Structure formats: structure tokens, C-alpha cells
Amino acid sequence: MVCAMQEVAAVQHQQQQQQLQLPQQQQQQQQTTQQQHATTIVLLTGNGGGNLHIVATPQQHQPMHQLHHQHQHQHQHQQQAKSQQLKQQHSALVKLLESAPIKQQQQTPKQIVYLQQQQQQPQRKRLKNEAAIVQQQQQTPATLVKTTTTSNSNSNNTQTTNSISQQQQQHQIVLQHQQPAAAATPKPCADLSAKNDSESGIDEDSPNSDEDCPNANPAGTSLEDSSYEQYQCPWKKIRYARELKQRELEQQQTTGGSNAQQQVEAKPAAIPTSNIKQLHCDSPFSAQTHKEIANLLRQQSQQQQVVATQQQQQQQQQHQHQQQRRDSSDSNCSLMSNSSNSSAGNCCTCNAGDDQQLEEMDEAHDSGCDDELCEQHHQRLDSSQLNYLCQKFDEKLDTALSNSSANTGRNTPAVTANEDADGFFRRSIQQKIQYRPCTKNQQCSILRINRNRCQYCRLKKCIAVGMSRDAVRFGRVPKREKARILAAMQQSTQNRGQQRALATELDDQPRLLAAVLRAHLETCEFTKEKVSAMRQRARDCPSYSMPTLLACPLNPAPELQSEQEFSQRFAHVIRGVIDFAGMIPGFQLLTQDDKFTLLKAGLFDALFVRLICMFDSSINSIICLNGQVMRRDAIQNGANARFLVDSTFNFAERMNSMNLTDAEIGLFCAIVLITPDRPGLRNLELIEKMYSRLKGCLQYIVAQNRPDQPEFLAKLLETMPDLRTLSTLHTEKLVVFRTEHKELLRQQMWSMEDGNNSDGQQNKSPSGSWADAMDVEAAKSPLGSVSSTESADLDYGSPSSSQPQGVSLPSPPQQQPSALASSAPLLAATLSGGCPLRNRANSGSSGDSGAAEMDIVGSHAHLTQNGLTITPIVRHQQQQQQQQQIGILNNAHSRNLNGGHAMCQQQQQHPQLHHHLTAGAARYRKLDSPTDSGIESGNEKNECKAVSSGGSSSCSSPRSSVDDALDCSDAAANHNQVVQHPQLSVVSVSPVRSPQPSTSSHLKRQIVEDMPVLKRVLQAPPLYDTNSLMDEAYKPHKKFRALRHREFETAEADASSSTSGSNSLSAGSPRQSPVPNSVATPPPSAASAAAGNPAQSQLHMHLTRSSPKASMASSHSVLAKSLMAEPRMTPEQMKRSDIIQNYLKRENSTAASSTTNGVGNRSPSSSSTPPPSAVQNQQRWGSSSVITTTCQQRQQSVSPHSNGSSSSSSSSSSSSSSSSSTSSNCSSSSASSCQYFQSPHSTSNGTSAPASSSSGSNSATPLLELQVDIADSAQPLNLSKKSPTPPPSKLHALVAAANAVQRYPTLSADVTVTASNGGPPSAAASPAPSSSPPASVGSPNPGLSAAVHKVMLEA
């Protein structure tokens, strides 16, 4: 439009200049030409220019020969030019018809227009007349000039031709001879024809003419308005057929009457001056004067004013109509119908002139082109679409603004462009305004211009477009809260953008692959190229690490220094793994918790995968980060974790055999790090997506590198579980390593100070304490198996406390407990549970002072299952000899544990026996089996290893030559003990690794004396123990405090019982003096009834557990022991047990007094040894009772003298409340003839002393007998919760239920209850079943007045 208006203005300026030149041209034409009357038809090619072809037709009163003479020379001169122009015209038309249609966008404003004045019938006739005249004169007539058409309607063409013909009929324009003006116009004509061959026109020598009062178009028509409708579609090839049709329509228009002519006269000003600038005629009219020309100009100006007023009225009507259409409810429908019916646009950029022009275009087009692809059809379609879009924009403006505010979630003026819409909704919600219901069925069209007409529908539309009631704030928002809300919204927006970007990046596999590979190469220093050079250099000239450690393995200072350097070197590598994880796409979007969880769980895995190429299986070594080589044997000797090292090397060899590339290693590291199955992750969805994409990238790389190995990816992923297992083992090892070495320097300084004090004080220094006074129980203190709560009850008394109290033995001078605690406070605190230090590994006891009196039994003994060790065992030879001469049965569980337990421990030294490794002659190594996680006790790295370990098994760690010598010497010493004391029946089993058959004890002392550093190491205090820490954690709990209280009571009760048994045994008859062989070598479970004082009973009970294959893992903590214990008693059973104990305690004194009456009065069968079957039954059913009593072999005959019920007292936690009526001399022996049964509520075993079951005999049916003396018969007892309490007259005693011990499924046991009314102690004889009558029946007391009630119980 702008270009069109500029062109129109330029044309108007040219026309004004031509109007000024018009009077001068007219005067020249009047002077130089004769007055001749002729009609001139002008064929004008107009682009504001001047290609004119004038054909003159003489009038009837003028002779033909004059005109012929005048123009003869002219036509002859023009004949050649015309022929050439016709040829050019013909060629241009052919090219134009054959060319493609010209698009609207390619048309320029300056286009040449064909003007043909044959639309009116008179003009057609004149053209035919001229053609006939030219044929007579052998001249070719002027034909149509070819141009391209413009884009507007052809109504202006009709106006132009009509105006021309009207002016010629009235003879208003006088044109005379053409020669004077010919000089002014030929150059533009030549230039114009030269620019384009298709724009050629017929030039004339004298195109002089007068201008037909051209004026600017007041209607504002565009430049593209054409003047001939026939050529609006130049790309159609049916041009001549359409031309004939147009002629017929024009004939109908001429015969329409004078109305059509008046309309044509009323529109002379509508001539598009941009296309036609001048109209030329060559025949002057003498009748026309300047006055007539002035009148013509006056008429044209009046007509222009009339047209302008009409256009203004139409514009006003259209605007009103547009306003009405917008206000209507169905505006869209009206817009569509209006656009289709009328082309008068409702566009914001259109004016009234354009609207009128569009109407005229439609009127002219209806009579013209019938093609759908015509220019006019395009214009009408475009205008209708433009109007529709304009209306849609106005209608949807508020909706778009509302949607934009709804997307941000806040209704603020900063978000929306219109503050009123926001304020209306906010006021409506805050003030709770109730608007009047809509009267138009609630279907009002809410637009920007009419939104205030119906507030009800306006509020309804606000809610419909997404405005939220919750987003409206009632009151002022604080600045802090507002800033927080804005920050949260901004963060949410950024997160959404990052997530979209991440999704795009993850979906783009090449991009993800490139990012991961770039991250791996930038953060990993150990690529295949670099590592290959390092491995080659290590093979050619290796530089081994840790030479100082190998030279002096007991000196920890160089190792600590190297470890610090090692940690510093690894810090950079670990940092590289962290940076690599951060560069993985999507990792930065995770929360801090998820990042920490993934890195903590997968850091070692990824690091190990990166460094897997540093393992060289060809030289059986590993290349350190500094380029040095560390041999596999050195790692084993230093860390003493062979299983972990072997597993690591095997896994490395397995991974290196796959020959992974750098790309595969990088992607595999990413998969190891980004694993969705880590516990504690929150954003699982994102992590799973990342994992799947990374796995797809790895699959793509593997398929590309190894097309012939389709199962390679599955094989690679199968290594992840093994990798995690190694990571777990390594982490456990690091935890222990970190815990130990925090106190390493302080502990060594402490040991050095104690070692200096040990030179002058042999019996008072810490070394003297470890060498002399530290017996098995005190020094050994297996913290891994004995909890700190039990250690609190230990007593640092002399070893004589473990001896029988009835025998006085000369003992060497011992240190007092107070002196021990004062000289070794750390050890005392350790044993009492106050300081959770762990015992050092391989730290045996050495004694340079008093070496002749000491015997080093073993340097250390391992507790197999949990990786803990026992500290050195130092034992006095005199004490050992005294105990062996006396033949005490419980010497295996006293403080000198190593002396009498040689056979059992040597059997346990065998690899197939994994039991308590506490032997006097053998030292047991730790099992390096898959159960070993690689966690050692703490100082395994300082062990002096053997140079050649050819005789070691593949499942054990290599030991030093010192250990081998000690093992062999211990075996030899044990063999000597067996020879000297054959009654112990010690079965000697040679160690597994014994290069020498026997070694003297002097060699052991010499080895220790020659190695003072080893002596100090072995005398060093224990290190921290994680098991003790766990025990300390459980200690404050009230549940375990209660258990400790019960255990203490149980220990006291059992100790008193075992003490009385020892006294009676020592003062027994000569029959009992020889020790039976069947009791001399009991298994550890059967020999667990040794007597002890109350102070040591708890530790004693724990070390002598009844289970034959008790795993030390079960004694890892109090909780583990409680879980491994036997079933607990129900509250009802506990109540019954308490009642029984109360009644038993009442008769303890009377039972003790009654035992002194029958000394030596025993039946012959009572002193016999029970048969092996009975012993087997005893061992079989020893721990099967779960109620209140343990099984015992019932005596087949009871003498009348054995009526006293001297039962061994037991606490509520002890289930061994069995009290058989025995003789005075063997009451305790018969009572303890069965195994001790552990309480469900205690973590230690009882201490019933195993004695000779001489009171038992061959009994076909073992019965369970319980005798209870009730002092007061007026107190009834209710033993069952379900059964009612029997009346006191019928029930005067307690009936206790027990599990029968017999092989048969059912057993009837006789329980004899005797009630006593304060008289002498009553005795009840329990008869055997009817099938087996007793051999001798004891006669009851004649003074017995209570009835005997027998209760048969089905088991």
C-alpha cells in the first residue's frame, strides 16, 4: 500500500507538469496545422510513459487523397519499424503464453499496461474502418500492444475507455500536427521498449496531444489497478476466445441505455493515473475552445466531489455495520458470512477508498474472468482471510492474555497486558461479589471492547481460561515471602528447562556418547596408551616398593609414611572419579543426597574399573600410581588378607582378558556409578532413565567394536556383582585400618615405656604382668566372644582360686589384684569393658626375666569365625605340674586353660575342626576362607613371615619361621605331657605345618630373647576392637542390664553348687579316688562342668559352652548371643521356676544336714559306672529340655539313707533345677551327672561339675523324678493357668511338668510329691514303672503323715 501511494503521488506530480505544458502545445498545434476534422484512436502503453501509436481516420467531408498524401511518407517510413515491432510483439506473446503464470508477489508496481479502446461499440467500428483504410494503403494496422497486467480490477479500464470515447464524440480535445512534440517523447519510448521485449509498443513520430484533465484519485486506489479486464489473467492460453466473450458483454453494456453512460460520465476522475498519464489524439477539432475545456474541468471537479461524499457515506455505514457485527453474540458466523458476501474489508489497515475499490473489483470481475486462479480471485480470497484474522485477533486478545497469566500462576499487572482483567477477577474474588445472572443464556461473547456489558459471563470466562481462585491473595504479601515465591517459581522454571534439555540430550545417543567419552578422557589419567608404557617399563626395569617394610616388618614408621604418601596419590585419582560423575549428563540435576548416595556406593567400583589395567598378571604384581611395582606376595605378607588379594587379582585378570577399550571402560564406569538399585535414592525415575540410556550407549559401542561377540555385553554386566563384593570387602578392611592406625603411635609409645619399666620390675611392671600374672582368663580375654558386660565380673585373683578349695596347694608368689590393676590400668580397663581395645594379633607373651620358670605355650591363638585373636598365654610350669599331679577334672577351664585341653585343641587345629581354638600345645591360624572378609585383628601387617611357605596350604596365610618353631615346640611339649601323665588320655595330633618333628622349649625362649623388638610388640596392649565397641553400645540398654543381673545370680548359684560338689568329691571314699577314663577326656561340651569360684564363673561358663560346634560368630555381641540362645521361657514358666526356687531354698538347710548321716552307706549298684548307653542318652538329651528341668538318669535303687534332698540351687534363668536324692557323699556328683543346660535368658552356660555318674545303673525306662518338700501345706499352688487351683486338702505339694527323656514317643513319668508339716525331713521313693520293678525299694520314714499323690504325665 505504501509503495502504491508513493507511485500515485509521483504520477500526480508528472500530470501537473504536463497540464502546465498543455496550453503551449495547443497554440503550437493551432498555428502549424490545418483545420481538419478527424477521429484519432490512441493505443497507449502506459507506465506514466509515452509509447503511442496514433491511427487517424478522416471525416466524411474531408477528401481521402489529402490525408493519403499527408501520411504517405509517414507510413512508408514506419512500415519497416512496424514490421519489426510486430515480430517482436509476436515473439513476446509466444514466450509469454508458453511461460509459467506470474505470481502476485513477483509483480512490480511499474508494469506496462495494454490499453485497447474497443470496449465500446463505436470504438470497435472505428477500429474496423481504420483497418480497412490501412489495407487499402498496404499498411498494417496498429494491433494490440502486449503487456503484463496488474493485480486490481478491470473496472478502471472500462472507465478509461468510456471517458476517451465520450471526449472524442464531443470534440472537446483538439490535437493538431504531431511533429513539434515528437522530440520530447521518443527517448522514453525507446528506453521503455528496450528494457523488455515483451513490453514493446508501437512508436509514433509525433505523439503530441493534450492531457484529458488527469486528476489524482481521491478514493486512494492502489497502483496495481489495471485498465483492461481481458488481460488480468495473462497466463491463460485461451486469450482470444476470452476476448470474443468480452466483446459480447461490452455490446450488451452499450445497449443498456443512458444510465450506463451517465455512470461512465460520473467517473472520469477514477482513471488510474498511475497507468495512464496522457491521452493523445492526432486530429484537431476546430469547434473546441478553451472555454469548453474549462467547462469540462469544472464538471469533472463536481463529479469528484459527489463521488467523495458518496464514499464517505459508505465508509460510515460500513463502520456502523462493523460495530454491530462485533457486538453480536455470533460474531464469528457473521464475520464469515460478511467476508464471503462482500469484499469490503473490516481490516484495521484498510480505508474507505480500498473498500470501494474492492467492491468495484467484484463488480468488474463478475462480468470478466471466470478462472478460479485468477488475480481477482486471489485478491478476494486474501482480503477475506485477512478480515477473518483481524476479527479473530480482536476476539482472542483477552483469552491470550488470560492464558499467559494462568501459565505463570500469578495474576499481576506485570504478567498481563491488561490490568483491568486482572483487577476485575481479583476484586470479584476478594469482595465475593455476586453478579446479576446473564440474560442471554450465559453465552455472551467476551471481547476486549464489550467485556463490561455482562460481568457474569466475564467472570465465568476468567475462570474458564484458567484464572485460579487460590492465586488471589487476601491482603499484602510480605517481601520475604514474595521473594521466596518468586525464587521458587524461577527455580521451577529453570528445572523444567533443564529437564527438557536433559531429555533432549539423553535421547540423542551420539551426543550422550560423546559427552561421556569426553568426560572419561579428561578425568582419567590411566588410559590404555599411558598404562601400556608403564607396564612395559615395569617389566623391563621394575622398581619395587616397600623395601623397608620387607627388611624390618615390625617397624611401623616407614609403613605409616608410605601410607600417607599413598593416600595423597590416591586423592587425585578419587577426585577424578568424582569429576567424571559430575560431567555425566543429568548428574547435576540430582539432589545432594542422591549424588552422595551414588558416589559413596559406587566410588570404589568405578575407581577399581579404572585401575584394573594396573594389574599385571604376567609378572604377578601391581603397578602403583607412582610407577613402582608391588609384588603380589608382598601385598599378602603386608596385609594378611589373602582371600581379598587373591579375589582382587583374579577379578583383574578376568577383566583384563576382555581387552576393553577406553570408550567401553568409560561407559562401564558410568553404568557402575549411575545404578538405580542403590538404597536410599529418591529420584529413581531420572536415575533409571540415565542408566538405560548409558546402557544403550555401551551396547552400541560393544556392537560396533565386537560384532562377532553378541554375548559380550551380558558377560561384562555379569562382573558387576563380583565388583560390588570386592568393594564391600575392601570397605570393611579400610574401616578397620582407619580405626587401628589412629591409635597406633600412641599405643607403641605406651608399649615402649612399659618395656623400659619391665627391665627393672619383673613382677610389678606391665611386662611382668603379661609374663607372670596374666593367666589364660585374664590375659586372653576373648573380647570377640566374651562381651564387655561379662568381663566386668572378672576377678584378678590368684590362680589358686580356680583350684579346689578343699585342697591346699603350694603356689608361687602371685601378684595381688590391686597390684595388677594399678600396674596395667589399660589392660584392667580392657578386661572390665571400660576401654574397648582389641588384642593385637600374633602378640605372644615373652619373658626375658624369669625365663627359666615360664613356658610360652603359644604366641597367639585365633578365634576363627570373626577374625579376632587371643593374646599371649603365659603359664607357670610349677602350677601346671601341680594341677596334673592332682588330676583335677576342670583344669581345662580354669585360668590355665592350655594345660589340660591339649587333645581337644589339637583336634581343633585340624582344618576341618572350627571350634574354640584354645589349646596349650597348638596355635591355630585364622581361616582365610570366603568367610574371611579381609578384616584382621590389627597388627597382622607386622608379622614376620616365612621366607618360603612351600608347606602351607592354599587356604591359609603364610606364617613366619618363628611361628613354625613355636608350633613344633608346643607339639613336643604336649607330647611330653602325654607321656608323663597318661591318665589324661591326651591324643596328640601333629600340626598341619610342621617342618620339624620336635623342638625343645629352650629354642622358644632363645628366639624371644634374640628379638627384643618382637618382645616389645608381643607385650604391647591390644588395639581397639569393633566388637567391644558394639558391646559397649549394647551395654547401657535396660534389657541387657537385666540380663546381666540374672546372669550374675545364675553364676553365683551354680558356683555354690559346684563348690559343694568339689568339697564332697575331695573327701570321698577310696572308690572315688581313681578317675575314670571315660571322664578324663570329655569333649569340650561335656567337660564344661568344671568348678570355679563365684568371681570367675561367668567367663568360665562362656568359655565352656555346651554346644559342641558353637560358632564364634554367635558370640560376636550380646544381641547375636541372645539370638543364638535356646528358646526363652514363657512368663508362666518363669513364674513356676521362681516358685520352685523359693520352696527349694526353704529346705536347703535341712537337706544339707541330712546328707551327713549316710556316709558310706550306699547300695552296691550306686557305685558302679553307668553303661555307655546311659552316657549316650545323657549326652543326647542333655540340652533338649525347654521347660524347667534337665534330664537325669534315675537311680535304680535308692538307699534308705539317701532321703535328703540336697538339690543344687539354681536361679530363675537356670533350667537345671534337678535335685535327685542321693547319698551324702555323692549327692553333688549325682546331681551334676548330666550336662549343664543353658538358660534361655542367659548368654553363658552353667557350671555343673561333671562327675562320675556312679549312682546310676542299668535302667530300662529313664524317669524324671522331682521331690519337693513343702513346709506349709496351707499354701495352695496353681501350676496351670487353665486348670483351677485344687483344694488344699487334696494338693499339698507342687506338681512340676517336665519333658520325659526317652526314645519312645510317649512316656509316663512318676512324680512323687511328699508334703511335710514341719517334722523331720521326709523322703519319698519314686517307684519305677510296672514293667521294670526297682531292684531295691527304699523304706519310707514311719513318721510320715502326708499322703502321697502320684501324677502321671504324658510327654
From Swiss-Prot:
Residues 218-228, 254-264, 1149-1162, 1174-1196 have a biased composition (Polar residues). CDD domains: NR_LBD_REV_ERB. Residues 66-76 have a biased composition (Basic residues). It comes from Drosophila melanogaster. The keyword Transferase does not apply. Its main location: nucleus. Residues 60-91, 126-228, 248-268, 308-344, 780-821, 927-964, 987-1007, 1051-1117, 1147-1260, 1312-1344 are annotated as: Disordered. GO terms for cellular component: nucleus. This is Ecdysone-induced protein 75B, isoform A.
